[in-house]
Amino acid sequence: MRRYTFQLLLIPMLSLFWLTASCTHRDVHFRIGVSQCSDDEWRHQMNNEMLREALFYDGVEVDIRTVKDDNAQQIEDIRHFIQEGVDLLVVAPNEAAPITPVVEEAFDRGIPVKVFARKILSDKYPAY
């Protein structure tokens, strides 16, 4: 009887294991890189909302990088996203002039760019 009980428990436990293991694996088909210029409460909330929305779509991954009003770091982060080959780049520029060339670089490489919060000094982005 004891062996039978163990076998009865083993089958549901293994089923549960396989079910949870399959839920944790997500194939990423669309990568979004987000470059934030600062990390105040408003932007924290925005980041959390973007991450939450991405959970509703299988295969979507959002990578958010935040700088603390540092143009050089933001340029480095955007270049990282370009090298990683993101499918969409979302940028909140710290300042327009320093960030414009790297956003143009992403655009010229065929990466769609969404600029928000402030514009850059170029028209090489499809959405503001």
Model-derived features with residue positions:
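Short, low-complexity disordered leader/linker segments with a strong preference
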Residues: 1-30, 104-111
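Basic side chains
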Residues: 2-3, 43, 65, 118
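Composition-driven detection of intrinsically disordered, low-complexity segments
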Residues: 12, 79, 122-124
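Flexible loop/hinge segments that line or gate small-molecule binding clefts
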Residues: 96-128
